[in-house]
Amino acid sequence: GSWSTSRELAFYPNVKFEGIAFRYNAKTGKVVLSAHYEDQSGYVAAKIYLAQITPKGELEVGTMERPLGYDSRDQSLFIDDDGTAYLLSATNMNRDINIYKLDPSWTKPVLLVNTICKGLHRETPAIIKKDGEYYFFSSKASGWYPSQTMYTSAADLGGEWTPMREIGNNSTFDAQFNRISTVGKTCGVWSYHWGAQRKYKTPAGNFPRISIAAFNKGYASMDYYRYLEFSDKYGIIPVQNGKNLTLNVPVTAAVPGARGIKADCITDGACTESSTYFQKSSNAATGSP
């Protein structure tokens, strides 16, 4: 057998698995499977499923229960620089987020390290570490509809975390936050537009939307670009089509009700809609508005 050989690992006819993910544990040489476990009918089991596998070996289930007795729904794994793995889990009926330390095999929770985001109803938990600082990202529980991505940061997983901060726009560019990953020298935020699941379906259906994230001393930002390129050397490269024709072009307020209001900001290139407060004196591509 090899890593590309298809075979059935296990069969659970009466179980639903959500948020399935795979991580390679270099210390054991095995791949760890993590998932949210629910019974086929209902949504009250709220268990975590952790197992490990090799190409020729049998599936070894480490955990198929509530972690340390706590209910668990949306979940993910975070691997620290020293190879220690942590389970991030939405708990207390999605009100809080628990952080558990896992054993060396990454298949069994052994310690509740912290409970964060208490009472905030955050989902799809994810942590990334940059320059010694931990950043926790999540979406708000909102069904299939967009929600505001928020983050918090800390110097220690078990220590005090900052208050939640907003990042991106208030709809995460018409999507829900899902994960954050390092690509080359850059970081990408993956969010999903669940258009096929909405009451009024969107033409494009379901698709991922990727934003570029930046970090600095506990603060984070992310920007949306319609087009991206991926480079083995540079990571994610934003592609901005078009040209800003009004850069450094003087502008004046032409609407009577806007007299005395500074108009400089209207040429910053950030607004793509017509303004009811400022009018161009000419529709020419260049020249003074």
Where do the PLM segments sit?
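Signature of short aromatic-glycine-proline-rich micro-motifs recurring in repeat-based ectodomains
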Residues: 21, 178-180
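Small/flexible residues
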Residues: 25, 49, 181, 211, ...
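Beta-rich carbohydrate-recognition and catalytic domains
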Residues: 1-19, 23-122, 129-134, 138-171, ...
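Disordered, acidic Ser/Thr/Pro-rich linker "stalks" and the adjacent N-terminal cap
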Residues: 235-289
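Short, solvent-exposed loop/turn motifs
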Residues: 186-187, 271
